[in-house]
UniProtKB/Swiss-Prot annotation:
Keyword tRNA processing part of the UniProt annotation: no
Modified residues (N6-(pyridoxal phosphate)lysine): 267
GO biological processes: protoporphyrinogen IX biosynthetic process
Cited HAMAP family: HemL_aminotrans_3
InterPro entries documented for this protein: 4pyrrol_synth_GluAld_NH2Trfase (IPR004639), Aminotrans_3 (IPR005814), Aminotrans_3_PPA_site (IPR049704), PyrdxlP-dep_Trfase (IPR015424), PyrdxlP-dep_Trfase_major (IPR015421), PyrdxlP-dep_Trfase_small (IPR015422)
Protein name: Glutamate-1-semialdehyde 2,1-aminomutase
Pathway: Porphyrin-containing compound metabolism; protoporphyrin-IX biosynthesis; 5-aminolevulinate from L-glutamyl-tRNA(Glu): step 2/2
Species: Lawsonia intracellularis (strain PHE/MN1-00)
Record-linked PANTHER family: GLUTAMATE-1-SEMIALDEHYDE 2,1-AMINOMUTASE, GLUTAMATE-1-SEMIALDEHYDE 2,1-AMINOMUTASE 1, CHLOROPLASTIC-RELATED
Name of the gene: hemL
Length: 430
């Protein structure tokens, strides 16, 4: 078969697939270029169809933490596949993975596997509405909980209270019960509880916001949400699709000592294969069919390949010291910030655990409104220059870069050397 370049493949793809990609951000339009097509991946690196080896800080949007094609995980997948790729019936691996996840999260008694993070959040919302008999849900502006209609809401009129559809195709009635508040703004949340508390089924929150770049929670924010939910009989749902098993083995909730009513998971728990899950206290989870009255199902839920990959991944993570990688990332982020500041640009590199975001601003960042004021043109220059020098960052100024346990000192040094080669024009800075 004749080899084709990324450019040739993309020109074909745009005629066959909307935008040439199967998830919008991959098109790289936010950074002013076309996507590269990947041939293979190993450890901390991707290899494009053009033969370029890229140091990977995307890591399949956080789904990879051990490094690409970890031999233990891939060998387990091969063995599982030899016994059948899907059964449509229960298998041993789903029991093993379920127990592993439940043991990692102190407040979780039961878990249900699905095939994506969107399915997990959609199902958790349905469960919350079902057990409370309420319809309204509160989410935070800039936080992403998948593409189910109730979560695709934009801020409407009022003090971050009323919603309008965030995309065509979502009826206004669908987001009418979605309330919005700025992330880290507990005061607005309190006001919303005063107005709508008796109708509020759930509060959804990313414990560390990672879809508006990386914005950690302010001290007291998460505990304040827990207290408000307790006072009003509202379920607190932590979306740990990104942070679960990334910031700690038991997720962000163990870092911040917060026990939610329900938790949504994805990415890492699938070992690089498609997965989602939602779990929590038995008194809620027992309402899910066939045990209870709230329906949710899936043809490939509990797929044996995915369950095997996830279980093997978590087995390896149990014996890994997260603190070492966290310190390495913090050092790298600080050094990267110094390099970029020396080029005369306003910049800060936010980091937490094995995640970081380069924000081109000197302003304090605590919500999506703050993030929107950053210089996205400078980020586009950063992305293109780094990719030219074999470093693959997230192709959007509002996403979060990821680091794996396969990233060692030489990888961080390689990225810093590439950053030193970036040239910014004064017109871009202004």
């Amino acid at each position: 078969m004749q080899e084709e370049s990324s450019k040739e493949l993309y020109s074909k793809a745009v005629k066959l697939i909307p935008g040439g990609v199967n998830s919008p951000v991959r098109a790289c339009r936010n950074v002013g270029c076309e996507p590269v097509f990947i041939e293979s991946a190993k450890g901390a690196y991707l290899t494009t169809v053009d033969g370029q080896e890229l140091l990977d800080f995307v890591l399949s949007w956080g789904a990879i933490i051990l490094g690409h094609t970890n031999s233990t995980v891939t060998n387990a997948i091969k063995k599982a596949a030899s016994n059948g790729t899907t059964f449509g019936a229960p298998c041993k691996a789903e029991v093993l993975l379920a127990k592993e996840i439940i043991d990692a999260f102190p407040g979780m008694d039961m878990i249900r596997m699905v095939s994506s993070g969107t399915e997990a959040t959609m199902s958790a919302l349905r469960l919350a509405r079902g057990v409370t008999g309420r319809n309204k849900v509160l989410k935070f502006i800039g936080c992403y909980h998948g593409h189910a209609d109730p979560f695709l809401a934009s801020a409407g009129s009022g003090v971050a209270t009323l919603s309008i559809p965030g995309t065509p195709g979502v009826p206004e009635v669908t987001v009418r019960d979605t309330l919005l508040a700025p992330y880290n703004d507990l005061s607005t949340v309190k006001d919303l509880f005063v107005m709508y508390g008796k109708d509020l089924a759930a509060v959804f929150v990313e414990p560390i916001a990672a879809n508006m770049g990386l914005i950690p929670p302010k001290e007291g924010f998460l505990k304040g949400l827990r207290a408000l939910c307790d006072a009003h009989g509202t379920l607190l749902i932590m979306d740990e699709v990104i942070t679960g098993f990334r910031v700690a083995y038991g997720g962000a909730q163990t870092r911040f000592d917060i026990t939610p009513d329900l938790t949504t998971l994805g990415k890492i728990i699938g070992g690089g294969l498609p997965i989602g899950a939602y779990g929590g206290k038995a008194k809620y989870m027992e309402h899910i069919a066939p045990l209870g009255e709230i329906y949710q199902a899936g043809t490939l839920s509990g797929n044996p390949l995915v369950m095997t990959a996830g279980f093997e991944t978590l087995q390896l993570l149990k014996d890994i010291n997260y603190t070492i990688l966290e310190k390495q990332v913090a050092t790298f982020a600080n050094e990267l910030e110094v390099i970029l500041k020396d080029k005369g640009v306003p910049v800060q590199v936010s980091n937490f655990a094995s995640m970081f975001t380069v924000f081109f601003t000197n302003n304090e960042l605590k919500s999506f409104d703050d993030v929107k004021t950053t210089n996205t043109q400078l980020y586009s220059i950063l992305f293109r220059s780094m990719q030219k020098n074999n470093i693959f960052l997230v192709p959007s100024p509002f996403e979060t870069n990821m680091v794996s346990f396969a990233h060692k000192e030489k990888e961080f040094e390689k990225a810093l050397i590439a950053a030193k080669k970036i040239m910014f024009n004064i017109t871009d800075v202004n």
